[in-house]
């Protein structure tokens, strides 16, 4: 059976899972406006309005299972379950409007006994390329036996959050749910939010 994302409610025509670097370069150059290659061979892209992280727009779902392990305040800002699901559905709806989706299945951490299996679902080739550099890519055999991921990132960053929804301060929202093991990104195409999301999980577990 071919790989698909239907279990997440995502069904698109083109799906690229752990695409090669040359393939991602080609897709970025041919499908993403303004993308070019520098004289050093680096892929140059536009990340949109956001050119850096948005720490004030990061939220963590407040849940009885983990709330006493988190120092809530100006850095760790709480989000309720209902709003998380609104944002998750918004991201999935956006992903379903795209003609192509990129998936990166990779590991966070070197030690096989402790590493996390992470699945990134995104709409831009440069996002996939970035996360292939940030995480540890599986061998062909490891990918074949990857199974279910420990965490899933839904990167719907090309679509804004509804700033009138409770707990939202702007059209950008990066939401972490430690219990459902999901991260939702809206309103920013800055790739560093995916990396920081994974690092936040790793720091919490350590």
What are these model-derived regions, one by one?
Residues 1-205:
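A noncatalytic interaction/capping subdomain that flanks phosphate/NTP-handling catalytic cores
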């Amino acid at each position: 059976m071919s790989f698909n994302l239907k279990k997440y409610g995502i069904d698109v025509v083109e799906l690229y899972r752990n695409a090669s670097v040359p393939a991602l370069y080609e897709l970025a150059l041919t499908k993403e406006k303004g993308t070019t290659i520098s004289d050093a061979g680096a892929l140059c892209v536009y990340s949109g309005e956001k050119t850096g992280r948005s720490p004030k727009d990061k939220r963590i779902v407040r849940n009885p299972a983990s709330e006493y392990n988190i120092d809530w305040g100006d850095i760790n800002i709480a989000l309720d379950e209902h709003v998380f699901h609104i944002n998750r559905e918004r991201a999935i709806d956006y992903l379903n409007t795209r003609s192509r989706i990129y998936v990166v299945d990779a590991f966070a951490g070197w030690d096989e006994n402790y590493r996390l299996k992470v699945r990134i679902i995104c709409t831009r080739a440069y996002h996939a390329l970035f996360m292939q550099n940030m995480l540890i890519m599986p061998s062909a055999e490891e990918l074949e036996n990857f199974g279910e991921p420990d965490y899933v990132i839904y990167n719907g960053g090309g679509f804004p959050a509804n700033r009138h929804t409770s707990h939202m301060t702007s059209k950008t929202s990066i939401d972490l749910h430690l219990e459902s093991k999901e991260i939702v990104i809206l309103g920013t195409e800055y790739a560093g939010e995916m990396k920081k999301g994974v690092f936040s999980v790793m720091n919490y577990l350590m």
